[in-house]
Swiss-Prot record:
The modification Phosphoserine is found at S104, S107, S161, S187, S193, S195, S265. One of its GO terms (biological process) is regulation of RNA splicing. This is Heterogeneous nuclear ribonucleoprotein F. Keywords: Acetylation, Isopeptide bond, mRNA processing, mRNA splicing, Nucleus, Phosphoprotein, Repeat, Ribonucleoprotein, RNA-binding, Spliceosome, Ubl conjugation. It comes from Homo sapiens. There is a cross-link at K72 (Glycyl lysine isopeptide (Lys-Gly) (interchain with G-Cter in SUMO)). GO terms for molecular function: RNA binding; single-stranded RNA binding. Residues 13-85, 111-188, 289-366 form the RRM domain. The modification N6-acetyllysine is found at K200, K224. Changing R179A: Decreases affinity for RNA oligonucleotide 100-fold. InterPro entries: ESRP (IPR050666), Nucleotide-bd_a/b_plait_sf (IPR012677), RBD_domain_sf (IPR035979), RRM_dom (IPR000504), Znf_CHHC (IPR012996). The modification Phosphothreonine is found at T215. The N-terminal RRM domains are responsible for recognizing the G-tract of BCL-X RNA. The modification N-acetylmethionine is found at M1, M2.
Length: 415
C-alpha cells in the first residue's frame, strides 16, 4: 500500500511534453480536478544543465484517487501541446531533481553562463560591454571554436559571483548588433565538455588513393589508437588561467591528454561510426548519447532541430559545415541519456519542412552517465520494446547504428 506524501513513495505523477514557457499555474490548471499537495510547492519542473525547462515536471498529489484522476489527463492538451502523464514515485522524483539542472549534484555553477547566437566575429570586448556593470573574472570569457578554427557562435562567461551570474540571466534575448543573444545557466563541467575531449566535432576523412602518405598515417594513427602525440596549441582558446590552449589537432591528428591533463585514448574507442558509408568517420559527442541527422533543409536552424525532437530536449545541437563553408545537410544532436536518444529515434523519416529526415543512433547503455534505472525508464514511458529499434537491441549498439542504411544515397542539405 502506498504511503502518504509525508513518508514512503507518496502520490506522484510525471508530466512530459510541457511547453517551454509552462508555469506552475499552467500545471495547476491542467490538473484542476486534482488536489496538488502543498499547492504550487508541489509542482517541480525538471531543468537542463543549461537552466532551461526540459518540458517535464513532477507533481505531488494528495491521494491515490488524485493520481488516478491525473492519469486520465494523459494525452490531453495544454495550449497546442499534448501532455503525457505517467505514474511516478518519490524515489524517482528525488533522484531526477537531484541530478538535473545547473545546480544539480552532477555539476557546479561557479558563476558561469553560456551565450548562444553571437554574431560572426564577436569579440570578448563586445561581450564585456554586453554585460556592462557585472564583474567578469580575469580571463573569464571562453569563445569555443571548431577544429577548423571557426567560431561556434557560443561563449562561456564566468562572473565574480553566482549572484552576478544570476543577474546576467536578465540579459536573455537582448541584442549584440543585430543578433539577439540567448543566455543560459552553465557550469565549469559544461565548459569542460566543449574541450573534453576537444575532438568532439571533428570529422576525419578516409584517405584517398592519391593522398600523401602522411595523411594515411594520420588516419591510421587515430583508428588504431597508436602513435598518440600531444596536441599543439591553437584553436581552443579557453581563456582560463592555467588552462593550456589546444587546437585539438596535432600534425599527426593524435591525442595524449586533454587540457585538464587526462588521458584521451579512452575517447577513441567505440566512437567511430561506419554508418554513413565508407567515406567518413565521425567522432561522437562527449555525453555518449548522440543522434545523427541527415537530409536537413538548407536553411534549417538549431531551433528547427530542437522543435523537431520536441518534447524531448537535446543537450546540444551541432550543424555540420563542409570544407566549402556551407552546411552539409547533416547534424549531430546530443541527449543527456541513452533512453532519450533511443526515444528520439521515433522521429526517423519524419518531415522537417518538405524534407524527410534520416536519423542514426550512436548511443549505448554502457556510455550512460549514471542514468536512469529501469524504474526511471518506466516513469519516462520507455518500454523494453522502445529500447529496441528496427530490430537492433540498444544494448548491442556499439557506437554504430543504422548499418542497414549505409547502402542508401546520402541525403544532402541542398534543395
Amino acid at each position: 500500500m502506498m504511503l502518504g506524501p509525508e513518508g514512503g513513495e507518496g502520490f506522484v505523477v510525471k508530466l512530459r511534453g510541457l511547453p517551454w514557457s509552462c508555469s506552475v499555474e499552467d500545471v495547476q490548471n491542467f490538473l484542476s480536478d486534482c488536489t496538488i499537495h502543498d499547492g504550487a510547492a508541489g509542482v517541480h519542473f525538471i531543468y537542463t544543465r543549461e537552466g532551461r525547462q526540459s518540458g517535464e515536471a513532477f507533481v505531488e498529489l494528495g491521494s491515490e484517487d488524485d493520481v488516478k484522476m491525473a492519469l486520465k489527463k494523459d494525452r490531453e492538451s495544454m495550449g497546442h501541446r499534448y501532455i503525457e502523464v505517467f505514474k511516478s514515485h518519490r524515489t524517482e522524483m528525488d533522484w531526477v531533481l537531484k541530478h538535473s539542472g545547473p545546480n544539480s549534484a552532477d555539476s557546479a555553477n561557479d558563476g558561469f553562463v553560456r551565450l548562444r547566437g553571437l554574431p560572426f566575429g564577436c569579440t570578448k570586448e563586445e561581450i564585456v560591454q554586453f554585460f556592462s556593470g557585472l564583474e567578469i573574472v580575469p580571463n573569464g570569457i571562453t569563445l569555443p571554436v571548431d577544429p577548423e578554427g571557426k567560431i561556434t557562435g557560443e561563449a562561456f562567461v564566468q562572473f565574480a559571483s553566482q549572484e552576478l551570474a544570476e543577474k546576467a540571466l536578465g540579459k536573455h534575448k537582448e541584442r549584440i548588433g543585430h543578433r539577439y543573444i540567448e543566455v543560459f545557466k552553465s557550469s565549469q563541467e559544461e565548459v569542460r565538455s566543449y574541450s573534453d575531449p576537444p575532438l568532439k566535432f571533428m570529422s576525419v576523412q578516409r584517405p584517398g588513393p592519391y593522398d600523401r602518405p602522411g595523411t594515411a598515417r594520420r588516419y591510421i594513427g587515430i583508428v588504431k589508437q597508436a602513435g598518440l602525440e600531444r596536441m599543439r596549441p591553437g584553436a581552443y582558446s579557453t581563456g582560463y588561467g592555467g588552462y593550456e590552449e589546444y587546437s585539438g589537432l596535432s600534425d599527426g591528428y593524435g591525442f595524449t591528454t586533454d587540457l585538464f591533463g587526462r588521458d584521451l585514448s579512452y575517447c577513441l574507442s567505440g566512437m567511430y561510426d561506419h554508418r554513413y558509408g565508407d567515406s567518413e568517420f565521425t567522432v561522437q559527442s562527449t555525453t555518449g548519447h548522440c543522434v545523427h541527422m541527415r537530409g536537413l533543409p538548407y536553411k534549417a536552424t538549431e531551433n528547427d532541430i530542437y522543435n523537431f525532437f520536441s518534447p524531448l530536449n537535446p543537450v546540444r545541437v551541432h550543424i555540420e559545415i563542409g570544407p566549402d563553408g556551407r552546411v552539409t545537410g547533416e547534424a549531430d544532436v546530443e541527449f543527456a541519456t541513452h533512453e532519450e536518444a533511443v526515444a528520439a529515434m521515433s522521429k526517423d523519416r519524419a518531415n522537417m519542412q518538405h524534407r524527410y529526415i534520416e536519423l542514426f543512433l550512436n548511443s549505448t547503455t554502457g556510455a550512460s552517465n549514471g542514468a536512469y534505472s529501469s524504474q526511471v525508464m518506466q516513469g519516462m514511458g520507455v518500454s523494453a520494446a522502445q529500447a529496441t529499434y528496427s530490430g537492433l537491441e540498444s544494448q548491442s549498439v556499439s557506437g554504430c547504428y543504422g548499418a542497414g542504411y549505409s547502402g542508401q544515397n546520402s541525403m544532402g542539405g541542398y534543395d
